[in-house]
Amino acid sequence: MPRVEWRDEFAVGVASIDHEHREMVGLLNQIFEKLETETDRDAVADFLGEVHARIAAHFALEEQIMRQKKYDQYEDHKTDHERLLDDIRDIMDAHEDDTYAERKHAFADRLQDWFVEHFKTRDARLHKRLGV
C-alpha cells in the first residue's frame, strides 16, 4: 500500500506546526489504508470527506494568519494549498468511479511530492518570516 512517509526535512522547527503537519501526513496515510481495506464504500467516501474538511480547516486558519500579517507570498501559498485539496478530491473521484486501484501509486507520488515541496519551502519560509 502506498504511503507518504514523514521525513525530518518536513519539519519547520515550530513544534505545534510540525505536530499538525505530522497529523496531516497520518490522515493521508489513513486514506490509502481505508481505500485498500474498507469494504463499505459509503464509509470510505465519508472518511475522505472528513479528511478533506480537516485539512481545509487547517489551511483556512493558516491563510487567515497570512492575511492578517499581510504575508507577501499569500497567493502562492494559498494556491499550493488548493493543489493538495484538488489532489484529495481526485482521490475521492477515483474512489467514486472505481479507478483508484490503477492510480494509487501515482496518487502517492503526487502527495509525497507536495509535502516535500510545501513543507520544505513554503511553510518553512512562512514560519521563518512570520514566526507562526
For every predicted segment, state its role.
Residues M1-V132:
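Small-residue-biased structural context
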